[in-house]
């Protein structure tokens, strides 16, 4: 057991170039890692903001309703952040469907403004379950917001389009 612990300690020392101050090297590594994570989060937030601005500039209007759709190579958390930022920018008459293709897995994220839920009887959870079938998936959520995953990456664009179709604008 003592030899196993010593071997493990030697392996860790080797990872840190056999430094004499192993504790200090590990603390420095952890601090640098935390700093890099914060920088990545900041970069991702900036990317979401730029993407939001591009999508808003390209939003369609159908019968007075702003329709924002796209397929992007983003993570689920970024997709969620993005649609909520779009909803903040367009608080009324909004239908938004974002397809995500990160890690070669389709993810569909849908958000509606409250007036579309209340006055037009739209339910993102119900609509996304139907649209997700096109990507061999399933999901659900609340009346104003829902996410669905799937297996068929080729179906993500059709699923995004299906959301708009099912909204009956």
Model-predicted segments: where are they?
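Terminal appendage regions of diverse proteins
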Residues: 1-169
């Amino acid at each position: 057991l003592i030899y196993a612990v010593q071997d493990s300690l030697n392996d860790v020392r080797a990872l840190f170039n056999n430094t004499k101050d192993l504790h200090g090297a590990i603390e420095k590594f952890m601090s640098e890692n935390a700093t890099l994570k914060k920088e990545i989060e900041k970069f991702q937030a900036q990317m979401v903001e730029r993407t939001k601005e591009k999508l808003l500039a390209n939003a369609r209007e159908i019968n007075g309703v702003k329709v924002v759709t796209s397929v992007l190579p983003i993570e689920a958390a970024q997709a969620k952040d993005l649609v909520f930022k779009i909803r903040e920018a367009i608080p009324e008459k909004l239908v938004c469907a974002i397809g995500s293709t990160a890690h070669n897995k389709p993810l569909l994220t849908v958000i509606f403004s409250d007036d579309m839920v209340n006055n037009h009887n739209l339910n993102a959870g119900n609509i996304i379950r139907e649209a997700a079938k096109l990507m061999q998936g399933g999901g659900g959520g609340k009346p104003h917001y829902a996410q669905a995953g799937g297996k068929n990456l080729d179906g993500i664009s059709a699923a995004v389009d299906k959301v708009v179709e099912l909204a009956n604008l």
